[in-house]
């Protein structure tokens, strides 16, 4: 693309807002749509152009990015009567950055091809901080030629950007990410509560362990929030449960053993039943403190 393409962005949540902000700062004309316009007001003030419906974004953008909540939302946004596949211009690039079903990503890819559209599945990891700082890890599935055209856009939003394979490969890679995090969050929560119950200062304990063999993104970024009782969402409990459900379904189809994932999903479901579904995933520590 010689000129900067016009971007469309559907879904302005915790991470989507920061991603759009970075795209605007990078000089991209960006059209946006989300269910609640009030959530987009700050971005509109910063230069984003509001569109009343998804079909308007699709009809007027060269590259359409989606970052919605659940696979059913992805299906509606792409395949519905007012969706992207029915209204996008031929040769547009469609990038779904929602964590969603690998099978749905493959379905969207096939639908897109039949309409001379080019689809990538590109879920992300890095949370609210990674989105704000443009340091997301982006896991991409799709064709190399399309990926290369979209790469300058990805580079505004992330730093670790890898084409993992054909359609669906990005979503499968994100499932690997979520499976690893699922058990890790149990360990991080247990470690913090152990330190507290042993009468230690958990902050200084963290200084000792985070740079050693126990180190992880969750330990460095979420354990401090656990210690200071900051449970606002960088990533929602309800969305993590959704991700683990998708991962378990995919793993079952492959005949895998997933005891850690199953336990983590159950614990997070218990947490959600206590009214924490809109909290950040670090709220898991509450289960261990209250035991």
Please provide the spans of the model-predicted regions.
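Active-site-proximal catalytic alpha-helix in oxidoreductases
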Residues: 66, 134, 138-141, 162, ...
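Rossmann-fold dinucleotide-binding core
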Residues: 100-178
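Rossmann-fold NAD(P) dinucleotide-binding segment
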Residues: 54-117
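Hydrophobic residues within alpha-helices
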Residues: 19-20, 39, 108, 153, ...
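Residues in the short beta-alpha loop(s) of Rossmann-like NAD(P)-binding domains
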Residues: 35-36, 70, 143
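NAD(P)+-binding Rossmann beta1-loop-alpha1 motif at the extreme N-terminus of oxidoreductases
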Residues: 1-66, 97-98, 128
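Interdomain hinge/lid region at the active-site interface
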Residues: 171, 215-279, 291
């Amino acid at each position: 693309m010689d000129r900067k393409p016009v971007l469309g962005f559907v879904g302005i949540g915790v991470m989507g807002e920061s991603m759009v902000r970075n795209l605007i700062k990078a000089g991209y004309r960006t059209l946006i749509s989300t269910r609640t316009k009030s959530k987009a007001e700050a971005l509109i003030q910063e230069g984003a152009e509001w569109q009343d419906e998804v079909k308007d974004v699709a009809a007027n953008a060269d590259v359409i990015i989606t970052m919605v909540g659940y696979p059913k939302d992805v299906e509606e946004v792409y395949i519905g009567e007012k969706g992207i596949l029915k209204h996008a211009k031929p040769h547009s690039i469609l990038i779904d950055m929602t964590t969603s079903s690998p099978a749905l990503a493959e379905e969207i890819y096939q639908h897109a091809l039949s309409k001379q559209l080019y689809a990538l599945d590109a879920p992300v990891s890095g949370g609210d901080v990674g989105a704000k700082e443009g340091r997301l890890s982006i896991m991409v599935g799709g064709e190399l030629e399309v990926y290369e055209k979209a790469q300058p856009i990805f580079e505004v939003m992330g730093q670790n950007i890898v084409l993992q394979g054909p359609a669906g490969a990005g979503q499968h890679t994100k499932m690997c990410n979520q499976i690893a995090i699922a058990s890790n969050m149990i360990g991080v929560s247990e470690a913090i509560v152990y330190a507290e119950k042993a009468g230690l200062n958990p902050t200084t304990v963290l200084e000792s362990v985070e740079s050693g063999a126990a180190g992880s993104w969750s330990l460095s970024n979420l354990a401090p929030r656990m210690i200071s009782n900051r449970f606002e969402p960088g990533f929602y409990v309800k969305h993590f449960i959704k991700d683990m459900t998708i991962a378990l379904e995919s793993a079952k189809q492959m005949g895998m053993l997933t005891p850690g994932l199953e336990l983590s999903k159950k614990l997070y479901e218990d947490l959600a039943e206590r009214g924490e579904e809109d909290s950040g995933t670090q709220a898991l520590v509450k289960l261990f403190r209250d035991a």
